Every structure is written in structure tokens, then in C-alpha cells.
Amino acid sequence: MNEIRVTQTLDTLGLRCPEPVMLVRKHIRFLEEGDVLLVIADDPATTRDIPSFCQFMEHTLLKSEIEHIPFQYWVKKGK
């Protein structure tokens, strides 16, 4: 598989719901369509919240690693 080219990394370690998703929303606004935001989190709620956010906001969750903490999510900005 090709390596995912990350545009920006967002560290939300230590933050709890709803802060991680709020920060993702804030940071992704400043990215261009097609850019990738790597989100690093340790809040178990992000395993549900990040995929839901992507679907609702029409972004693409390219990959997630949620077997071990820290969790990692690669979010590609949509339109």
C-alpha cells in the first residue's frame, strides 16, 4: 500500500470528548480539499466520533489504527 502523505498532524492526547472532534473540525477548515490531517488521540470516544464526523462532514477516513493507544486517524478533507 502506498504511504499516506500527511499535510498536518493534530495531537489531541489527554483531551476528552468533545474536545478532540472540535479540534479536528477547527483544524481541517484551514486545509485544502484533498489534504490529509493525521489525528492522534487517546480518548476511546474518538473511535466512534471521528468516523461519524467524517461521514457527516463529507471527509474521508482513509485509515484508522485503533487497536492500541494512541489511536491514529488519517482524515482526507472533502469539499
From Swiss-Prot:
Any GO BP: tRNA wobble position uridine thiolation
Subcellular location field: Cytoplasm
Alphabetical keyword list: Cytoplasm
PROSITE patterns, per database record: UPF0033
Origin superkingdom: Bacteria
Active site: C17
MF GO annotations: sulfur carrier activity
Gene Ontology CC: one annotated term: cytoplasm
InterPro entries per UniProt: Sulphur_carrier_TusA, TusA-like, TusA-like_sf
Xref: NCBIfam families: PRK00299.1 (NF001423)
Primary role: Sulfur carrier protein which probably makes part of a sulfur-relay system.
UniProt-listed PANTHER family: SULFUR CARRIER PROTEIN TUSA, SULFUR CARRIER PROTEIN YEDF-RELATED
Family: Belongs to the sulfur carrier protein TusA family.
Name of the molecule in the record: Sulfur carrier protein TusA
Species of origin: Pasteurella multocida (strain Pm70)
